[in-house]
Structure formats: structure tokens, C-alpha cells
A protein has these predicted regions:
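Active-site microenvironment for binding and transforming phosphate-containing groups
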Residues: 164
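Short, glycine/charged-rich beta-strand-loop motifs at protein surfaces that mediate ligand recognition
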Residues: 155-159, 183-185
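Glycine- and Gly-Pro-enriched alpha-helical subdomains that act as flexible
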Residues: 133-156
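Short, contiguous, pocket-lining structural segments
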Residues: 24, 134, 160-161
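A generic structural motif
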Residues: 29, 141, 157-158, 222
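Conserved alpha/beta cores of soluble small-molecule-handling proteins
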Residues: 1-126, 130-131, 170-244
Length: 244
């Protein structure tokens, strides 16, 4: 795994089922191609080949390509906590330039350091802040339910990564009566929210019970509905495929 400059590597993290199939591979591949283009990294022509897990549980696979690499690098690991209530801290968001912000790239250590800071504070995740607004999570996408029933997400222009899981929910929530709006997740929006969740490939849908020691929200309706939507999504055969 590269730990140098952003243009040394591009990667994505996928969910793998017990048959070795990947969830939402087309979306992951499209994002890889987009990020690789922005980082000027040439991807291999052949598809990555994943090992079939040795258990009946889902796993995660980090699929990466180095700047000068001719092949994919794949690191598989178990899923940690998923679909749980968690506690979070705020942490300064890493910044590069407009072309690089929002890419999953080789200079990923600031995200890992944010996660470590959360763990050292006895928490589960870090919410990344730039100019007094939450722009991303250390490994998941923030979504906020306001008092009017609108779900707010930070726009990609704020510098966060466009999450694959978040995009699935963004498409499905309006049919359940939850309009989704892109905007700034400022202190007032977060403090007055009905519920704050983090969604991601590994975390699933986690309700953020507290942020920097302050309790958040009064309801669990958003987390429950999102968990139900993802359950439906992952039971659909079309969601899963072998990379190719």
C-alpha cells in the first residue's frame, strides 16, 4: 500500500459475498476510472481477481493500482462493526487541490490518522470538517435528517468522496418520502438534526449517537429505513457480480 503522494495510487474498497462476488462492481469500476483519470494513473486492462472467502460471511477487499504498477493489488479483510449505533468525533479534513480532493488516492494516511484519533478518544469514527462544515467521514458518508424530513448530504464540491453506498440510498430514499438535498452540513444543521448517520461499504448504516460527546438526534427512522433499503439491495441478484 502506497503512503506517499496522491498520484502514487488509486483504490476502492468493495463488499464481497461468500461466492466471491462484488456488490455494485460497475459503480466501483466507474469511480476507479474517474479517479484514476484525475490522478493520471493507467489502470490494468484485465479485471481484478478476488479470492473466494473461506467463510460464509461477507468480507471487504481493497482493490488498488499503483502509478507504475502493471497489475491490481488486492487486500482482503473481515468486516468490522456494521449497522450499529456509534460515537464520533470531529477532525480536520485533509485538503489537496480541486482535482485531487474527493479521490481515493495514495496519500490516504490523513484519513487513517483521523480514524485512529477517534479510536484513541474511545469513539468509532471521525467526521471530517472544513470551514466549519462536515464534508466527509474517515471511511463513510454522512447523511443528516432535518426536522422537515429532508436528508442532507455534503456536495462533492466540498471535497468528500462520492460514496457508492450513499449513492444507492440517495436514489431510493425519495420513494419513501425522504427528499435528498446536497448542501453544507454546518454546525446548526448538525446540532438541530433529527438523526445523523454514516453509510459505507464496510459500515453499512450506522447511527451516530454522539458527536464530540454531545448527543445527536431524537429518532431512528432514517437509519432504520436505510438499513431496510440496503437489505433489499443486497438480496437482489443483480447487485452482485464478478469483476469484469
Amino acid at each position: 500500500m502506497s503512503s506517499n503522494g496522491p498520484r502514487d495510487e488509486v483504490f476502492t474498497t468493495v463488499l464481497v459475498n461468500e461466492r466471491g462476488e462484488v456488490a455494485d462492481w460497475d459503480a466501483h469500476r466507474q469511480r476507479l476510472e474517474d479517479h484514476a483519470g484525475r490522478l493520471r494513473i493507467a489502470l490494468p486492462d484485465e479485471a481484478p481477481v478476488l479470492n473466494v472467502p473461506l467463510s460464509s460471511t461477507w468480507t471487504l477487499a481493497r482493490i488498488s493500482c499503483a502509478k507504475n504498477g502493471a497489475a491490481w493489488t488486492i487486500e482482503q479483510r473481515t468486516v468490522g462493526f456494521r449497522d450499529e449505533a456509534i460515537d464520533a468525533i470531529t477532525h480536520p479534513a485533509p485538503r489537496w487541490n480541486e482535482r485531487t480532493n474527493g479521490c481515493k488516492h495514495g496519500a490516504w494516511s490523513p484519513y487513517n490518522e483521523a480514524r485512529k484519533a477517534a479510536e484513541e478518544a474511545g469513539c468509532d469514527a471521525a467526521l471530517l470538517v472544513h470551514e466549519h462544515c462536515i464534508v466527509d467521514g474517515d471511511r463513510a458518508t454522512p447523511m443528516v435528517l432535518d426536522e422537515d424530513g429532508t436528508v442532507w448530504m455534503a456536495s462533492v464540491e466540498e471535497g468528500g468522496v462520492a460514496g457508492i453506498t450513499a449513492s444507492v440510498l440517495e436514489r431510493q430514499l425519495p420513494r419513501l418520502g425522504f427528499p435528498v438535498v446536497k448542501g453544507k452540513l454546518n454546525e446548526r444543521t448538525v446540532a438541530r438534526c433529527e438523526e445523523f448517520i454514516l453509510v459505507g461499504t464496510g459500515m453499512g448504516v450506522c447511527r451516530v449517537d454522539s458527536l464530540d460527546g454531545e448527543l445527536l438526534g431524537q429518532t431512528t427512522v432514517l437509519s432504520q429505513r436505510c438499513q431496510e433499503l440496503l437489505h433489499e439491495h443486497f438480496t437482489e441478484k443483480a447487485t452482485w457480480s464478478l469483476p469484469g
